[in-house]
């Protein structure tokens, strides 16, 4: 007896529908609010939370478009994970997050912050950003010319190169590594999914941009330095100002590792437990400060500030040879420093377990507007995200913040989804291999596919009246369809 590939594929399709339908049913049961309610209706009530049960969840859910049938699944699985966040870089959701009491966080800078500022969850992250070694030889000219830029969009400033730094700044000896400890459960953070710290214009920062735009209008912020400040600092300032009445602790973003924008260092939410002077490698190794290469010091430079090599004196050539050698050695140090940060970030591929998520108050753009299935091309702020929808999302965030978050009261959906993947991914992969094997579809292939799928369906199926001689292959499709109705 021969079987058609279409028939076997139907079995797999039904199995997937059963599995995803079961997951979607569970998500409704536990109130993931981002996709749960009809337009213009909030799921969050600060004083009267809805009771969502297996027998009434239909009142709180709506169909999700097929193209994004796995979007919420992938968003939850990628949350607080380094590589999955990079694979799905354009985030569209706000995850309520809690940083438990006693958690250590780090900041490298020249002074103790008093307002909003960045903290890193790993000291390698802060160390890499805070310790910028002075450059030697020809490399020092590149840095002074602003090759890497300091403008809002990364463009280097126009005009002549800046003067060399004053002597007391050459070693940057005032840089400090600060270690903070959470003095209480910081239970009002918003974690922005995707590669939300990426300074791009391709959507990674849409969740911050949307909040910033709505906040500007709601708070009537007409003169807050919008054109002079770096975009991410402007967003952070607005978000913290908006969130202050609600007790917002800050936002959490994904960089190489996870970073926290803490809204207020002066409150009783964190305590400074360590402050160490950061020592520059050249100071530690006893090397002199870099030679100042400028026209004032007698160096041949053209109108662009570049060295005129054929006009160098023998002494200048010797200085450059020596310092270029030091710079080459320091480049190895900087490479290892960057590698340490990458390794610290990669350690969280399986999750940043020092941060906990309360999935009950998840707010997402999924099913509010069209979200492209391609994780690299989707945008939260597309044509379908009307101003009214943006206001609705911010309204849901405000109501969630009024409640406060408690991850211990939330279903751990990431754990549940991980179990589904671990259990069923091998099954689906094996069935796919069987169906896509070379040669004609014959009884042996059909039997092998049935052997893998039969035991998945039967435990959740009722006997089918009138079915004789057991379940044949195509009878299994009917069996699974019945299971789907029962589920």
UniProtKB/Swiss-Prot annotation:
Q: Which domain of life is it from?
A: Eukaryota
Q: List keywords of the entry alphabetically.
A: Glycoprotein, Signal
Post-translational note: N-glycosylated.
Protein name (Swiss-Prot/TrEMBL): Uncharacterized protein YPL277C
The ranges of region (Disordered) come to 141-176
Q: Which GO terms describe its cellular component?
A: membrane
Known InterPro entries for this protein?
YOR389W-like (IPR038921)
Keyword Glycoprotein in the entry? The reply is yes
Specify the signal sequence span: 1-31
Q: Which residues cross the membrane?
A: none
Glycosylated position list: 40, 68, 150, 220, 304, 367, 442, 448
């Amino acid at each position: 007896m021969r079987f058609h590939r279409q028939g076997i594929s139907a079995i797999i399709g039904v199995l997937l529908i059963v599995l995803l339908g079961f997951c979607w049913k569970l998500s409704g049961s536990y109130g993931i609010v981002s996709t749960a309610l009809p337009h213009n209706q909030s799921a969050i009530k600060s004083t009267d939370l809805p009771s969502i049960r297996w027998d009434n969840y239909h009142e709180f859910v709506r169909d999700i478009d097929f193209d994004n049938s796995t979007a919420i699944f992938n968003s939850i699985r990628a949350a607080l994970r380094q590589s999955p966040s990079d694979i799905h870089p354009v985030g569209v959701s706000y995850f309520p997050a809690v940083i438990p009491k006693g958690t250590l966080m780090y900041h490298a800078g020249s002074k103790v912050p008093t307002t909003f500022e960045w903290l890193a969850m790993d000291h390698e992250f802060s160390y890499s950003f805070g310790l910028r070694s002075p450059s030697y030889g020809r490399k020092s000219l590149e840095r002074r010319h602003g090759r890497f830029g300091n403008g809002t969009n990364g463009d280097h400033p126009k005009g002549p190169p800046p003067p060399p730094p004053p002597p007391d700044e050459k070693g940057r000896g005032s840089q400090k590594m600060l270690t903070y400890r959470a003095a209480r459960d910081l239970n009002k953070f918003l974690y922005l999914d995707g590669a939300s710290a990426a300074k791009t214009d391709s959507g990674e920062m849409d969740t911050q941009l949307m909040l910033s735009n709505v906040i500007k209008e709601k708070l009537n912020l007409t003169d807050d330095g919008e054109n002079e400040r770096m975009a991410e600092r402007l967003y952070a300032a607005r978000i913290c100002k908006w969130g202050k009445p609600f007790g917002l602790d800050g936002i959490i973003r994904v960089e190489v590792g996870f970073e926290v924008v803490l809204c207020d260092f002066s409150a009783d939410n964190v305590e400074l437990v360590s402050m160490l002077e950061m020592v520059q490698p050249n100071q530690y190794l006893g090397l002199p400060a870099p030679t100042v290469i400028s026209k004032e010091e007698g160096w041949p430079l053209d109108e662009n500030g570049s060295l005129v090599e054929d006009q160098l004196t023998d002494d200048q050539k010797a200085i450059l040879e020596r310092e270029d050698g030091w710079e080459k050695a320091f480049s190895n140090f900087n490479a290892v420093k960057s590698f340490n940060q990458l390794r610290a970030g990669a350690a969280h591929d399986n999750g940043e377990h020092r941060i906990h998520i309360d999935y009950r108050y998840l707010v997402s753009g999924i099913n509010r507007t069209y979200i492209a299935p391609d994780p690299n091309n989707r945008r939260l702020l597309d044509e379908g995200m009307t101003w009214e929808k943006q206001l609705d999302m911010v309204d849901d965030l405000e109501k969630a913040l009024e409640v406060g978050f408690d991850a211990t009261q939330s279903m751990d959906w990431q754990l549940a989804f991980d179990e589904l993947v671990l259990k069923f991914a091998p099954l689906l992969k094996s069935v796919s291999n069987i169906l896509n094997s070379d040669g004609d579809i014959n009884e042996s292939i059909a039997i092998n596919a049935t052997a893998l799928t039969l035991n998945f369906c039967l435990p959740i199926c009722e006997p089918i009246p009138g079915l004789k001689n057991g379940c044949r292959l195509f009878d299994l499709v009917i069996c699974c369809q019945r299971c789907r109705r029962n589920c």
